Amino acid sequence: MTRPTLRETVARLAPGTGLRDGLERILRGRTGALIVLGNDENVEAICDGGFALDVRYAPTRLRELAKMDGAVVLSTDGSRIVRANVQLVPDPSIATDESGTRHRSAERAAIQTGYPVISVSHSMNIVTVYVGGERHVVADSATILSRANQAIATLERYKIRLDEVSRQLSRAEIEDFVTLRDVLTVVQRLELVRRIGQVIDNDVVELGTDGRQLRLQLDELLGGNDNARELIVRDYHASPEPLSEAQMTATLDELDALSDTELLDFTALAKVFGYPTTTEAQDSAVSPRGYRALAGIPRLQFAHADLLVRSFGTLQNVLAASASDLQSIDGIGAMWARHVREGLSQLAESTITDSLS
């Protein structure tokens, strides 16, 4: 059976959920609690004492049962309270960095059973959730919103800079004057935007119903970013042939694996794209295959763009092709040939106009 992830568990504890309501009642009562979010033979094996309930979950019931010293065990889907006033006896040999008895039991139980375990501290008035070997302190909405709004402001600045360098790259593509440095600058900015977007997305998940407006802002700022990453990888990877889906995914995974420090190093980015890692190589000329430019043509399907790229090889060859040349490609009819030809002409014209404005 697949065990819940930290992200899934945090979403279950977000404002607006029944579990969060119960936890807030416990915090207001300052009684503390230990709650296991799942039940099977592994959980039963570490439970001692207490009593079976098997009643429907309700925040008020959780609050009342938490007044006892023992742990509360919920069903795996969280819909029922299975046991209460239970003493958890996990394997003491499981390593833990926690100092408090309740927190040590919670971390060990989470590791041993595979189910999330929540510890509510009555002295510090905080909620900590343990999932496997991970630990997460549940913050209040005001704290998360303040942090997320600062991150949104940073994301907006990153997005403005990304748009600038993307326009510069598009202009260089039309003029056939692209250097590897131009490409890596855009790649770096795309990845920075993606990473800060992930941080904000985690905050949105934790905010639950309180994060709806933030979700709208995030979706607007990140719209098209993942697609832009895929297109630039397809356009500029050093592979002699257009990338397969597996190769593109592997390249994106390599980008994901770069540390924040490596992301600022163009030689590390160049290595991911299959180029030499020397500083001199960054000023060398490179030619786009044309995926980015063709993606700017309305209603042109990726399959058609891929056909054109595989037939002509580079964007400059596609730009130089006439409508009849385009139509000669198997799978590109007269209508699409005219549409592509007109679209590329308009794209080149608008790019040059933008550079002059």
From Swiss-Prot:
Cofactor: Mg(2+)
Enzyme class: transferase
Keywords, sorted A to Z: ATP-binding, DNA damage, DNA repair, DNA-binding, Magnesium, Nucleotide-binding, Nucleotidyltransferase, Transferase
One example GO MF annotation: adenylate cyclase activity
Enzyme Commission identifier(s): 2.7.7.85
Domain DAC: 3-141
InterPro entries per record: DisA, DisA/LigA_HHH, DisA_sf, DNA_integrity_DisA_N_sf, DNA_integrity_scan_DisA_link, DNA_integrity_scan_DisA_N, DNA_integrity_scanning_protein, RuvA_2-like
Reactions catalysed, as given in the entry: 2 ATP = 3',3'-c-di-AMP + 2 diphosphate
Binding-site residues, ATP: G70, L88, T101, R102, H103, R104, S105
GO BP term, example: DNA repair
Function field: Participates in a DNA-damage check-point. DisA forms globular foci that rapidly scan along the chromosomes searching for lesions.
Quaternary state and interactors: Homooctamer.
Stated family: Belongs to the DisA family.
Official protein name in the record: DNA integrity scanning protein DisA
Lineage: Bacteria, Bacillati, Actinomycetota, Actinomycetes, Mycobacteriales
Gene, per the UniProt record: disA
